[in-house]
A protein has these predicted regions:
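Charged, low-complexity intrinsically disordered terminal segments
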Residues: 1-207
Length: 207
């Protein structure tokens, strides 16, 4: 399926399909949501994630985002929104079930190398894959023109393909193998396991 965001413009019918699609998929999640997005600042999405975490005790959410915004305006907009998003989504939820993270590598000396995330992707329980142009930000949901693709798995091979894509991305961010990521995700404390997997001079996840 395709979901669009079309802002209010003269002689153009507006659309907020992306916003509604994201909320619907979050409310359908039961086990694991993986989000990879340049921005994580839309409070409505944070509230939906928090509500679903409280409704589904087995659900876990892992967000991988950028940690080093570029330019004065991006910095000002980014940090306030990220802090609010984090506070909302974590409210009343055990910390081992939700993490807002970034990927970085620490060389032997010098500053950490922070990976700049520009992708916009979400997986839901190996059942849904969303990939497109939409950031999890107020601007992207209302003012920009966006288009996202939604893939729904209706067979085991399709579910396996979505899981493989997610695990491949996590392997890149943690410097683990795909097989190692798969084993960690089967553990009860899987998010903590991914954050604790650190190697010298290689990329790993941190809060």
């Amino acid at each position: 399926a395709i979901a669009r965001t079309i802002p209010f413009m003269d002689a153009v019918e507006p659309a907020q399909e992306v916003r509604h699609m994201l909320l619907d998929l979050i409310h359908a999640a039961e086990e694991f949501i993986y989000i990879e997005n340049q921005f994580a600042s839309r409070e409505e999405i944070a509230e939906a994630l928090n509500q679903q975490l409280k409704r589904k005790p087995q659900l876990k959410v892992l967000v991988v985002s950028s940690y080093e915004p570029k330019g004065t305006m991006e910095c000002e907009a980014y940090w306030a929104g990220r802090i609010d998003f984090k506070n909302i989504v974590e409210n009343g939820v055990r910390p081992d079930r939700i993490r807002i993270t970034h990927s970085s590598a620490q060389p032997g000396s010098g500053d950490a190398a922070l990976k700049r995330i520009h992708s916009k992707l979400m997986t839901i329980d190996d059942r849904y894959l969303v990939i497109g142009s939409s950031n999890f930000s107020n601007r992207s949901m209302t003012l920009d023109t966006e288009c996202d693709l939604i893939f729904a798995a209706d067979s085991e091979p399709q579910r396996a393909a979505i899981a493989h894509l997610r695990n491949d991305l996590l392997a890149e961010h943690t410097s683990l193998s795909i097989a190692q990521v798969e084993r960690i995700l089967q553990q009860a404390q899987c998010i903590d396991g991914l954050l604790q997997a650190k190697s010298n001079n290689q990329y790993h996840l941190s809060e």
